[in-house]
Amino acid sequence: MPKKGLHPQWYPEAKVICNGEVVMTVGSTKPELKVDVWSGNHPFFTGSQKIIDSEGRVEKFMRKYGMSGGKKAK
């Protein structure tokens, strides 16, 4: 016989909320799940890629410290 009060409350219709809008329902141990990103607005799933950093880290380092990036001639 299973013990009473051992398992958490199960919510079969828990709301997933993104930007104040209910985007889907899932089963969870919490009645509401607040998320910043979900498959409906993530660039990988929507196909709309955004370029966040157009300059690479190495180029930024080279520019910051005044290095040309080439090897010195002997």
Swiss-Prot record:
NCBIfam families the UniProt entry points to: L31, PRK00528.1
Pfam families for this protein: Ribosomal_L31
Recorded coiled-coil stretches: none
Annotated protein name in UniProt: Large ribosomal subunit protein bL31
UniProtKB keywords: Ribonucleoprotein, Ribosomal protein, RNA-binding, rRNA-binding
Keyword flag Transmembrane: no
GO CC annotations, alphabetized: ribonucleoprotein complex; ribosome
Assigned protein family: Belongs to the bacterial ribosomal protein bL31 family. Type A subfamily.
HAMAP family, per the entry: Ribosomal_bL31_1
Function as written in the Swiss-Prot or TrEMBL entry: Binds the 23S rRNA.
A single GO molecular function term of this UniProt record: rRNA binding
Gene3D superfamilies per the UniProt record, alphabetical: Ribosomal protein L31 (4.10.830.30)
Record-linked InterPro entries: Ribosomal_bL28/bL31-like_sf, Ribosomal_bL31, Ribosomal_bL31_A, Ribosomal_bL31_sf
Any single GO BP term: translation
Domain of life of the source: Bacteria
Assembly and oligomerization: Part of the 50S ribosomal subunit.
PANTHER family recorded: 50S RIBOSOMAL PROTEIN L31, CHLOROPLASTIC, LARGE RIBOSOMAL SUBUNIT PROTEIN BL31C
